[in-house]
Regions:
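N-terminal cap/lid segment of alpha/beta-hydrolase-fold proteins
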Residues: 29-65
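Alpha/beta-hydrolase
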Residues: 73, 106-108, 183
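Short glycine-enriched nucleophile-adjacent loop
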Residues: 163-174
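The feature captures the conserved acid-bearing segment of alpha/beta-hydrolase catalytic domains
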Residues: 179, 184-198
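Cap/lid segment of the alpha/beta-hydrolase catalytic domain
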Residues: 77-89, 95, 105-131
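Alpha/beta-hydrolase fold nucleophile elbow
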Residues: 148-160
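Short beta-strand element of the alpha/beta-hydrolase
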Residues: 66-75
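Alpha/beta-hydrolase active-site loop
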Residues: 124-147
Length: 198
């Protein structure tokens, strides 16, 4: 009986130690980058006085460019935005890089490892879209300053909440932006009694 108790304690200790390592393993897996398509992460200034930093995954073809650019905007997972993992849209990015495009996937303020704050305007979907579009504007401004980007050939795309933000972005003057792509744009918000189905 004494030996069985020691074995259970050892097993429990090993199990708890393994659980403690899991977040580190998840972060390590998340940070694995595909250098074959020059994947890297940058921080783009955004927000009031450019105090926030947008964690942005970049993919680009080999060579100095300039390359046409597609900016792909993410949706929102249920729960707190800072718990959402970094989006990569890897397969889409890979397809565009193979066709000579650079790709940026910015995580907007408050999402994943981006700093700043996520602003929730409740049921006012117009305000939600415009607020999220501000971070896309910051990404565009940063991109236009890069010598490896063709600032006259930019496409902005978005999926779900990123699609809503992309459509909101379209109300502004966007020099060099040739297309806006919306993939099932919108925001489902059950928490505020928004009645999103109506």
């Amino acid at each position: 009986m004494f030996r069985a108790r020691i074995s259970v304690r050892k097993l429990t200790s090993v199990f708890l130690a393994a659980l403690a390592l899991l977040p580190g393993l998840a972060i390590e897996q998340e940070l694995q980058l595909d250098y074959r398509i020059n994947e890297h992460i940058i921080l783009i200034p955004a927000g009031e006085d450019h105090q926030a930093r947008l964690e942005t995954t970049v993919f680009q073809p080999n060579g100095p460019g300039p390359f046409p650019l597609i900016i792909i905007n993410h949706g929102k997972d249920p729960g707190h935005p800072n718990l959402q993992p970094r989006d990569r849209f890897y397969h889409m990015a890979h397809a565009f890089v193979e066709r000579g495009y650079a790709v940026m996937v910015p995580m907007r303020q408050g999402f994943a490892n981006s700093t700043g704050y996520y602003h929730d305007h409740g049921c006012d979907m117009t305000a939600n879209g415009y607020t999220q579009a501000e971070d896309i504007v910051a990404t565009l401004a940063y991109a236009r300053e890069q010598s490896w980007i063709d600032a006259d050939h930019i496409v902005v795309a978005g999926q779900s909440y990123g699609g809503l933000a992309t459509v909101a972005l379209g109300t502004q003057d966007l020099p060099g932006v040739r297309a806006l792509l919306n993939f099932a744009g919108g925001l489902r918000d059950d928490s505020n009694g928004c009645g999103w189905r109506s």
